[in-house]
């Protein structure tokens, strides 16, 4: 009669059991894809990656989601579901004859609703920061948190004087530049209406005045301003590994 070899049996079955356990621990909700969505009468290209609480990334004027690829990847790996959107008429989207921040804010608001996102956090760089602030002013209670880098809420007096003088008087027929010369048109009172925790940043050598950054952050009830030492408008943001740790620390501090 053949004697059953328990030792050999368990040696052969243990790797199978361990493999099954490991598979059960994998986060099957992790996603990575790109798509285009129609909102507010325009098509928006976006890249999505991760699993967990939603974070929306908004690039600067004339840029694309690719500018934020590093922070996108780092946040996804840290446990967030990240959506990097190409703003209307920019990146992979068809160009448009004119642009307004309020339209872009509505675009992102409708994106949030279409995707069924519950109080997402938004990080916006430059124009993207303007859009994030404008969104929460227009649609209060939509966002769970705001972080901005190099944002401004109005034009005159928000930029370093040597840049502002030449920029605002420069003749142009470029629609995106025309928008920046005339918008945004938000106010300090608008900032006081923002209810979500907000981190308002600019670089020490930014085009945006440090005093303007402080004006925004200090007038949002749950806001804070931070000037990033040694950095310019986008050096700590555009495909830089420096931004994600700042955002993750902010999200942790506010319980997001």
Could you tell me what each predicted segment is?
Residues 207-212:
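Conserved alpha/beta-hydrolase "acid-adjacent" motif
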Residues 77, 87-120:
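Active-site loop/oxyanion-hole signature of alpha/beta-hydrolase fold enzymes
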Residues 174-190:
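Active-site nucleophile elbow and catalytic-triad environment of alpha/beta-hydrolase enzymes
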Residues 45-91:
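Conserved HGGG/HGGXW glycine-rich cap/lid loop of the alpha/beta-hydrolase fold
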């Amino acid at each position: 009669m053949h004697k059953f070899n328990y030792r050999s049996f368990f040696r052969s079955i243990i790797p199978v059991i361990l493999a099954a356990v490991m598979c059960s621990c994998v986060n099957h909700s992790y996603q990575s894809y790109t798509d285009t969505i129609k909102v507010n009468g325009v098509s928006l290209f976006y890249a999505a990656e991760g699993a967990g609480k939603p974070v929306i990334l908004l690039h600067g004027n004339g840029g694309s989601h690719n500018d934020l690829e590093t922070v996108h990847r780092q946040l996804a790996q840290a446990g967030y579901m990240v959506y990097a959107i190409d703003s209307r008429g920019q990146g992979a989207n068809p160009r448009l004859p004119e642009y307004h921040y309020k339209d872009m804010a509505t675009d992102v608001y409708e994106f949030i609703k279409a995707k069924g996102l519950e109080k997402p956090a938004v990080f916006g760089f430059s124009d993207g920061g303007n859009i994030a602030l404008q969104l929460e002013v227009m649609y209060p209670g939509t966002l769970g948190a705001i972080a901005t880098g190099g944002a401004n809420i109005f034009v005159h007096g928000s930029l370093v004087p040597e840049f502002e003088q030449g920029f605002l008087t420069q003749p142009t027929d470029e629609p995106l530049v025309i928008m920046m010369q005339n918008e945004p048109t938000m106010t300090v009172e608008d900032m006081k209406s923002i209810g979500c925790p907000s981190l308002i940043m600019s670089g020490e050598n930014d085009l945006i005045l440090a005093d303007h950054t402080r004006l925004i952050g200090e007038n949002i009830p749950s806001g804070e301003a931070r000037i990033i030492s040694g950095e310019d408008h986008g050096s700590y943001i555009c495909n830089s590994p420096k931004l994600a740790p700042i955002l993750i620390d902010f999200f942790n501090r506010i319980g997001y």
